[in-house]
Regions:
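Short beta-strand segments enriched in small/hydrophobic residues
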Residues: 3-26, 175-184
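Flexible loop/turn segments at secondary-structure boundaries
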Residues: 18-20, 57-58, 84-87, 109-110, ...
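Short catalytic helix/loop segments, enriched in acidic residues and glycine
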Residues: 25-41
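Cap/lid and interdomain-hinge subdomains that line or gate substrate/regulatory clefts
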Residues: 45-47, 104, 109-244, 248
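Structural motif
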Residues: 52-66, 156
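Short, well-structured alpha-helical segments in soluble
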Residues: 60-73, 90-92, 260-269
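Anaerobic metallocofactor- and corrinoid-dependent redox/one-carbon enzyme cores
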Residues: 81-82, 98, 104, 111-127, ...
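A short helix->loop->beta-strand "cap" motif at the edges of active sites that frequently abuts
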Residues: 96-100, 142
Length: 363
């Protein structure tokens, strides 16, 4: 399952036409230079795309609506190179539906005291323009990230990178579909929730299927496909038999292989990115899906136990947000089980039967 998609972020620079063609040409050139530097930094996980300078109400509105309908656009970065009258931004900002970052920066690092003139003052007004823009987005109470500092600084780039991952979470949240095998585990409270509200607020779609309908998909997996996956298991994992009969053990492993293939095919066919099971309703399944769930999570699927669709959606979302992230430690469903209350060594042992994602394993 593909985790890191080809999302892009639009870089939109604000100005106005009264500065003249020469000044606006410099504004565009500087913006392109900033975009090129951000992309070449190696810090940002996603590409930044330069857009023509926004100087009118109509152009701002048109650009933001194009961002709304562009499926590759995951967010908009705005910066005011010169002064840009903020009333020109109102309609566009009202209609923007993509995540927004306000980059409060400027082209130059320092004031050129020895050479500064009116041309420089006319062209470089980020401190003035970004305050005007910041005023209107605050007045409109528009959620956004504000990053302050010079665009060449690594800490600024890292803040933009972190926002990009958050923006991906916002965009991808509306594409998450959770498949529940059966329903909530009987009498369990914490795994319940308001699925309608979740779809309204987050975009999550949660559907339940009879366990035996999914079991039919498992039963349809051929013996040859199952054996091929079992061979993959035996190549990948260290098998500890500990006195077990090897042939019998392998038959049990084959059940998990068949479940993995059956579940994955069902998920792909129905276009779900997360799955929920619970051990109180296994129907025709021969075993609790354990190793099968481990491997589905490793491939990028979300998972929640005992009917917990919220955890399943969040596991999927966190996997998407951290995809390709250096030093990412992995994402898994876990439950708090028991405490260690020794003073100075307090901790919680977390687990959940067999359904732990290998991405968090040490080794």
């Amino acid at each position: 399952m593909k985790l890191q998609k080809n999302y892009k972020f639009w870089f939109c620079t604000g100005s106005q036409d009264l500065y003249g063609d020469e000044c606006l040409a410099h504004v565009a050139a500087h913006s392109k230079e900033i975009v090129a530097a951000l992309n070449a930094s190696g810090v940002l996980p996603y590409e930044v795309v330069w857009k023509p300078t926004l100087i009118t109400n109509e152009l701002i509105r048109k650009t933001f609506n194009e961002a709304n309908i562009d499926e590759e656009c995951a967010g908009v970065i705005t910066w005011m190179h010169t002064f840009s009258p903020a009333k020109s931004w109102i309609l566009g900002l009202q209609e923007l539906r993509k995540p927004l970052l306000h980059l409060h920066t400027q082209y130059n690092v320092e004031i050129p005291y020895d050479t500064i003139d009116m041309d420089f003052m006319n062209e470089n007004q980020a401190a003035h323009g970004d305050r005007e823009y910041g005023h209107i987005v605050t007045r409109m109470r528009i959620p956004r990230k504000v990053v302050v500092g010079h665009w060449s600084e690594k800490d600024v780039q890292e803040k933009i990178a972190a926002w990009q991952r958050t923006a991906i979470g916002i965009i991808e949240s509306s594409h998450i579909r959770v498949m529940r095998v059966a329903d909530n585990m009987r009498n369990v409270a914490v795994t319940e929730g308001d699925k309608v509200e979740a779809q309204l607020k987050f975009g999550w779609e949660v559907d339940a299927y009879p366990v035996n309908e999914i079991a039919e998909s498992v039963a349809a997996v051929s013996e040859s496909d199952t054996n091929e996956l079992v061979d993959e298991y035996y190549d990948k994992y260290e098998i500890l038999l500990e006195g077990r009969d090897p042939a019998e053990f392998k038959r049990h492993v084959a059940v998990q292989a068949q479940i993995e293939l059956g579940f994955e095919r069902f998920l792909e066919e129905k276009n779900y990115q997360a799955i929920v099971t619970h051990f109180g309703d296994l129907g025709a399944l021969k075993q609790l899906p354990g190793l099968a769930i481990q491997r589905l999570m490793e491939k990028g699927y979300g998972f929640g136990a005992e009917g917990d669709w919220k955890v399943a959606a969040m596991v999927r979302l966190m996997k998407l947000m951290t995809a390709g992230m250096k030093d990412a430690k992995g994402t898994s469903m876990l439950e708090d089980y028991t405490y260690n209350l020794v003073p100075g060594k307090e901790g919680i042992l977390e687990a959940h039967m067999l359904e732990i994602c290998p991405s968090i394993a040490d080794g």
